[in-house]
Design a protein with these regions (language model features):
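C-terminal and inter-domain tail/linker signature
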Residues: 2-156
Length: 156
C-alpha cells in the first residue's frame, strides 16, 4: 500500500511539473518574439536615423508598409524619400533612443532627436507594428523640447 501511494505521489508530482513546464513555454515564446521585435526595430532605427544606411534599413520592412506620418507616403519608397529629405535638410540629425518597449507585435520607442547638434531637439514617440519579424506599420508623435518647463523632471 505504501509503495502505491509513493508511486501515485511521484506520478502526480511529475504530471504537475510537466503541466507547469508546458504552461511556461508559450509565455517564454511570446517573450522571445517581443525581444526579437524590439531588436529588429532598434537595429532598423540605428541604420535609418543614425547611420543613414537607407538600403540596410529598408531590409527591415515587410512587403507592405503602412505609414501614418502625414509627411510620408506608404511603402518602402515613401520611407526612403522621407529619410533622404530629412538627411538633406538636417545632415547633423541624431537620434538617441531613451526607452524601448515591446508588447506583442508592437514596439514603442521614446526618442530624443536633434535635427541640428546645437538645438534642444524633439521628444518623439515612435510606434511600430511587426508581422513575422518585419516592420509593417508606423505611427509617430513629436514634441519640441522647450527652453523652460513648469517642472524639473525633464522630457526623458
Amino acid at each position: 500500500m505504501t509503495d502505491r501511494r509513493a508511486f501515485g505521489s511521484s506520478l502526480a508530482a511529475a504530471a504537475a511539473t510537466a503541466a507547469a513546464a508546458a504552461g511556461a513555454t508559450p509565455a517564454h515564446a511570446a517573450d522571445d518574439v517581443r525581444e526579437a521585435n524590439k531588436r529588429t526595430v532598434l537595429a532598423f532605427y540605428d541604420s535609418a536615423l543614425n547611420r543613414s544606411n537607407i538600403d540596410e534599413a529598408a531590409a527591415y520592412f515587410g512587403p507592405h508598409f503602412i505609414q501614418h506620418n502625414p509627411r510620408s507616403k506608404d511603402g518602402v519608397e515613401g520611407f526612403r524619400s522621407l529619410l533622404q529629405d530629412l538627411k538633406k535638410q538636417f545632415p547633423g540629425l541624431r537620434s538617441d533612443v531613451k526607452r524601448a518597449f515591446a508588447d506583442g507585435d508592437f514596439v514603442i520607442l521614446h526618442v530624443h532627436v536633434k535635427l541640428q547638434p546645437e538645438e534642444l531637439g524633439l521628444a518623439i514617440v515612435e510606434i511600430f507594428r511587426l508581422e513575422h519579424g518585419k516592420i509593417v506599420e508606423h505611427w509617430d508623435v513629436r514634441q519640441p523640447i522647450p527652453e523652460t518647463a513648469a517642472n524639473t523632471n525633464g522630457m526623458f
